[in-house]
A protein has these predicted regions:
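Compositionally biased terminal segments of proteins
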Residues: 1-14, 21-309
Length: 309
C-alpha cells in the first residue's frame, strides 16, 4: 500500500500520483478518470480504516504496558529496544544476529517465567553475536534467505548517524555520546560479508557454543512501555559459556564473579523450569565439548543433579 495518493496538475490536466515512501518523488498512475478517482477513494477509505485499527491497538498496548509495569516484569532500555526493532524490520535479528551478554537475561527471565536472582543488571553497552548460516539461525531452520537491505552498521547509522567503528576495536561501534555496540563472531562464521563494517575477532572459540541448541525468542516491553523482540542463545549453552568465561585467564577480574553467578543461575533455571524445551539430559551432556564437560559435572556435583536419559 502506498504511503500517500494525491492529485497534481500538469498542462491543465489532473494526474493521480502515489508515493511508496516518504523519500519517494511520486509516480503518476494516470489522468483523472472514473478509474483513478475510484482508486483514490479506495485508498482514502483503507487508510482511514487502518488508522482506526492502529488507534485501537495503541489503546490495548497502553493497557498491557501498564499491567506489565505493575507486575514488575523485566524490561529493556528504550535505546536498546530501538536497535532491536530496526534489526527485526531489516530481517537481521534471529537470522544473522543474536543478543548476548547481560541483555540476554531479560529474555531468559520472561522465558522461564520467574525472577532470576542475578543476571538482569542494567548495562551501558550492547553485545550481539553473528549467527548467519548456523543451526540457531531462523533463516537456516526455515530454509529461507531474507532479502536484506541493511547491514548491522547500516542499521545503527540509520538510528544515530554519529556511530563510528572504533579504530582500536574494529568489532565495536561507538556513538558520539559513548554508547557501544559490539559484534562477536565464532570462528566458523568467518569471514563476514564484505559490506559489513564490523570486523570481529576470529579467535573467540567460546562463541561457537552460543550457536548450539535452541535459541529463545521473546517479546519484551521497554521502560516506556513499547515492545521489542529479543532472540538469545540457548540458556544451557549460555550458562556453560558464562562458567567458562569465569575461569578464562584473560577475563577481566571484576567480571568473573558475575559470570559465575549468571552461569549457575541459568543452569538452575533450566533444571527447574525448562525440562520440556531445554532439558539437561544425557543427550545434552553427550553434546558437550571437553572444555565444558567438567564445568557441567562440577555444577551437577554441587547441585546434587543427575541427568536423565
Amino acid at each position: 500500500m502506498p504511503v500517500s495518493m494525491y492529485w497534481a496538475t500538469k498542462d491543465d490536466t489532473d494526474y493521480l500520483y502515489t508515493k511508496s515512501s516518504s523519500n519517494d518523488n511520486g509516480a503518476s498512475i494516470g489522468p483523472r478518470s472514473l478509474d483513478t478517482e475510484k482508486q483514490l477513494a479506495e485508498f482514502t477509505q483503507t487508510k482511514g480504516e487502518l488508522k482506526a485499527r492502529i488507534q485501537s491497538f495503541d489503546a490495548v498496548i497502553q493497557e498491557r504496558a501498564g499491567l506489565y509495569r505493575r507486575l514488575r516484569l523485566p524490561s529493556l532500555p528504550d535505546r536498546q529496544a530501538e536497535i532491536l526493532r530496526k534489526l527485526d524490520i531489516e530481517e537481521l535479528l534471529g537470522n544473522d544476529l543474536l543478543v548476548v551478554g547481560t541483555n540476554a537475561f531479560v529474555a531468559y527471565e520472561l522465558f522461564v517465567g520467574a525472577k532470576l536472582p542475578t543476571g538482569n543488571e542494567e548495562t551501558e553497552d550492547f553485545d550481539l553475536a553473528w549467527c548467519r548460516g548456523s543451526k540457531v539461525s531462523l533463516a537456516t531452520l526455515l530454509g529461507n534467505t531474507p532479502a536484506k537491505t541493511k547491514t548491522l552498521f547500516g542499521v545503527l547509522k540509520s538510528i544515530d548517524s554519529s556511530y563510528r567503528i572504533s579504530p582500536r576495536k574494529p568489532y565495536q561501534a561507538v556513538s558520539s555520546d559513548g554508547y557501544e555496540v559490539e559484534l562477536l563472531a565464532a570462528p566458523s562464521t568467518h569471514p563476514l560479508p564484505k559490506n559489513e563494517a564490523f570486523d570481529p575477532m576470529a579467535s573467540l572459540i567460546e562463541q561457537e557454543w552460543l550457536l548450539k541448541g535452541t535459541a529463545v525468542n521473546v517479546v519484551v516491553a521497554t521502560i516506556r512501555g513499547r515492545a521489542a523482540p529479543l532472540v538469545v542463545p540457548d540458556p544451557r549453552w549460555m550458562a556453560l559459556h558464562k562458567l567458562w568465561l569465569a575461569d578464562k585467564p584473560e577475563r577481566r577480574f571484576d567480571k568473573k564473579d558475575k559470570d559465575r553467578r549468571q552461569g549457575n543461575v541459568l543452569l538452575d533455571a533450566a533444571r527447574y523450569f525448562l525440562q520440556a524445551s531445554h532439558p539437561l539430559n544425557i543427550d545434552f551432556v553427550l553434546e558437550l565439548p571437553e572444555e565444558l564437560r567438567h564445568l557441567f559435572d562440577g555444577w551437577c556435583a554441587d547441585s546434587g543433579f543427575v541427568p536423565e536419559s
